[in-house]
Amino acid sequence: MNISSKAKLGKNLKISDTAKIFDNVIIEDGVVIGDFCLIGLSNAVITSKKLIIKKNTKINSHSIIYQGSNIGENSIIGHNVLVREESIIGNNVQIGSFSDIEGYCIIESFSKLHSNVHVGQGSKIMCYTWLFPYVILTNDPIPPSDIRDGVTIEPFSIVCTRSTILPGKILGFGSFVG
């Protein structure tokens, strides 16, 4: 096990011997971290913000979670998931395998993202929302540019398989897309 002495660890953890826990990480009680995960990775911009993983969360193998993020209680992160910096993930959220959360995103409680979902930087997914496989939330209206205009999905919405939502769009309460 490769765990930084600066990480703060709760009780009853199950951390794989092949996982790496970096500085500035707080892991609460009952968290499970799978094989080959990188937890608390920094980048050139975010080098000293805390990553907080709240109690009873499960992070499956090969997932990477950057500093400055917050993962809520009882959440499940699938295999090979990337969660970039400054992402806030609520309680009881499920993020499927091979999904990509591009940073500065909010995913509220009780939301479910199936496998292979791409959430563009700056997107906001409100509570009780379902995104099915291969959904793409874009954020650059005139690529390649420095404009980042994330998608907002309001509560109780469903976005069906292979749907692409364009930058800056707001899907209203209870939307069904696909």
Go through each PLM region and give its residues.
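Left-handed beta-helix
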Residues: 4-5, 10-11, 16-17, 22-23, ...
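Blade-loop segments of beta-propeller domains
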Residues: 45
